[in-house]
Amino acid sequence: MVVMARLSRPERPDLVFEEEDLPYEEEIMRNQFSVKCWLRYIEFKQGAPKPRLNQLYERALKLLPCSYKLWYRYLKARRAQVKHRCVTDPAYEDVNNCHERAFVFMHKMPRLWLDYCQFLMDQGRVTHTRRTFDRALRALPITQHSRIWPLYLRFLRSHPLPETAVRGYRRFLKLSPESAEEYIEYLKSSDRLDEAAQRLATVVNDERFVSKAGKSNYQLWHELCDLISQNPDKVQSLNVDAIIRGGLTRFTDQLGKLWCSLADYYIRSGHFEKARDVYEEAIRTVMTVRDFTQVFDSYAQFEESMIAAKMETASELGREEEDDVDLELRLARFEQLISRRPLLLNSVLLRQNPHHVHEWHKRVALHQGRPREIINTYTEAVQTVDPFKATGKPHTLWVAFAKFYEDNGQLDDARVILEKATKVNFKQVDDLASVWCQCGELELRHENYDEALRLLRKATALPARRAEYFDGSEPVQNRVYKSLKVWSMLADLEESLGTFQSTKAVYDRILDLRIATPQIVINYAMFLEEHKYFEESFKAYERGISLFKWPNVSDIWSTYLTKFIARYGGRKLERARDLFEQALDGCPPKYAKTLYLLYAQLEEEWGLARHAMAVYERATRAVEPAQQYDMFNIYIKRAAEIYGVTHTRGIYQKAIEVLSDEHAREMCLRFADMECKLGEIDRARAIYSFCSQICDPRTTGAFWQTWKDFEVRHGNEDTIKEMLRIRRSVQATYNTQVNFMASQMLKVSGSATGTVSDLAPGQSGMDDMKLLEQRAEQLAAEAERDQPLRAQSKILFVRSDASREELAELAQQVNPEEIQLGEDEDEDEMDLEPNEVRLEQQSVPAAVFGSLKED
């Protein structure tokens, strides 16, 4: 039941409450200044009609006007009550008045100001809203202005009132100057580009400015250049030319874009000739190919657009294009620009490095057909290039300059150029030497032989002050007398044009200066030999040998010894031996083989056979390991030819001891084959037995097949058994090698035994050995399978004096100790039948005696 009551207080004659409100009313009467009591009461009355709820808020605020909680909830509730009403409804004005009343006490609360301003923005009352924002900024301390300004700026941007917004932004930038980019973007959007350019220029020049968008100073510069260059009619307060040129000095890595921006500014301003001047200045000053490409492409596009506009204008006026002189001029200008591109690009590269010799040569080639420009280019090049900073060979510029004059018939001018070149302080002696050689070649091409000799003799003359060839502190003019290039050319000219004595003097001088090469020494000796001065040529070889060490002296020794043997043969055998011993003393193993073979040939032809064998024996020790096998082959061949094959047994034995397993195996087979030919079956069998220790049956099946064939032909039951026993022993030896087993385990995949990685963690130490044992058992089983199967046919070895009856009886008996040969062995011995064995008498091979048989 609802009970309506009226309070007896005279100040509240209209206050009405229900029976459920009595407890809250009584509590309020006891604690009327308690915010919590009022809030509990208000929370209880949330479902009551809006006037009753508002009345309750008013009662509370009258007693507690400084309660932020009450005001915040009350204002929020009042705004919610009018949310779906028309903004012209009088209720909105009542809510606004409530906010104004609240600010009498709550003017320091930014949250209430923000809610009120947002409420006014929703009503669309622009002036009232702007003034309220201003009141909020005045009422709040400056530390809390940052909470008001974002909403204020959003309000300013939401209405097409640029002047109001500009004034607001200017005030905001005083508080937050780092937000200048936001203001600049607004100015651009509102088409106030002049002020935007001013603000952007200020930002760019402020070194302390940090972009909120993370833009670099160059990016801001680029925005400024684009802004002022693309809007010349709207940006009036800035000196665009000065700004962009200032950027050219600051941002040297982006010159192309800045130059294009400056030219674009003048193009949009209608100053086309000024824009063309900017382009020309740009392509003559940029330092990189990238910048040049940007500027040149923009320049060419500008000229094309000008020509297209001119042609369109002419067509509209009805004039013939052929009669338009201005159009012809523009076309000619555009063609000249395109034709100048390679030369302009070359200029860019030379501005990067004016000492780049190759680029100067390319520049000359670009002027092909224009002699005056070529001469000017060469002159500029030789004056610009510093030999100590040059990239390339600077002397080639002088030589090419002289060659240009020579090709055009101006021989005197060419001589003058080369003479000046000989006085240039080059960095390398070789440059000056090349110039002197070109001087000589110039005279030779025009058949001035005496002048050529005179020039080269002048170049090689001793200077007043001698200097070492590599002494960088001395000018190259004092060091060129030691240049081998000049001396070599002089020696060639003396051989062709001079006398024997003058040529000999030149070669002697080269040797005295110790600048000769092995080829120079050989040339000198050959020159003396051609003139029948044999001993002098040998002396030249000796002098050359004293100048060089191994391996450079190798060619000199080879030529010297060959010439000496060809000259004297066996007449000066002791001297030849001394020369060989001298050559071999200190000779590296790499070069010893040729000398030893030459030495042995000398002994074979003119000396003693035992001396030749001694030389071969020394050679097998002196050469490189890779050449020992070839050396032993030669040694064995020569020993067999001279002394007979029996003399090679010791050589074979030594070769087997020295050579690697692969080559030793081949030597053993050859050795055993030789013994077989000599009828020494036991010696051959011993060799096979020795060699078997280095022959793994799995990889050297050819050896075991050879031994098996040998035993089938020459052996008996016991020898074959011994061979098979040795084979099993060797195979077991190789099987038990841990390294081999490990490598085999890695190769086996998917086997039943598995791998170490398949084991459980913690068992690797014990199970590694288990796997090795399993693998060993597997390999042993394979070895058992590899053993020869029991033969179906029997090979019986019988005495040669057995009768046919005994042979037949033996053929029918089963031998309990018969040899188990494999199927392949059975096939090889199918032809052997237990018939009579015929013994043939063989003659001694002729190779046994060698060359001694002839004696």
Curated annotation (Swiss-Prot):
Pfam families: HAT_Syf1_CNRKL1_C, HAT_Syf1_CNRKL1_N, HAT_Syf1_M
Keywords, comma-separated and alphabetical: Acetylation, DNA damage, DNA repair, mRNA processing, mRNA splicing, Nucleus, Phosphoprotein, Repeat, Spliceosome, Transcription
Region (Disordered), start-end ranges: 810-855
InterPro entries xref list: HAT (IPR003107), HAT_Syf1-like_N (IPR055433), HAT_Syf1_central (IPR056350), HAT_Syf1_CNRKL1_C (IPR055430), Syf1-like (IPR045075), TPR-like_helical_dom_sf (IPR011990), TPR_rpt (IPR019734)
Entry keyword annotation includes Lyase: no
Keyword DNA damage: yes
Protein's cellular compartments: Nucleus
Residues modified to Phosphoserine: 851
GO biological process terms held by the UniProt record: blastocyst development; cerebral cortex development; DNA-templated transcription; generation of catalytic spliceosome for first transesterification step; mRNA splicing, via spliceosome; transcription-coupled nucleotide-excision repair
Subunit structure: Associates with RNA polymerase II, the TCR-specific proteins CKN1/CSA and ERCC6/CSB, and XPA. Identified in the spliceosome C complex. Component of the XAB2 complex, a multimeric protein complex composed of XAB2, PRPF19, AQR, ZNF830, ISY1, and PPIE. Identified in a pentameric intron-binding (IB) complex composed of AQR, XAB2, ISY1, ZNF830 and PPIE that is incorporated into the spliceosome as a preassembled complex. The IB complex does not contain PRPF19.
Family listed: Belongs to the crooked-neck family.
Protein name: Pre-mRNA-splicing factor SYF1
Organism this protein belongs to: Homo sapiens (Human)
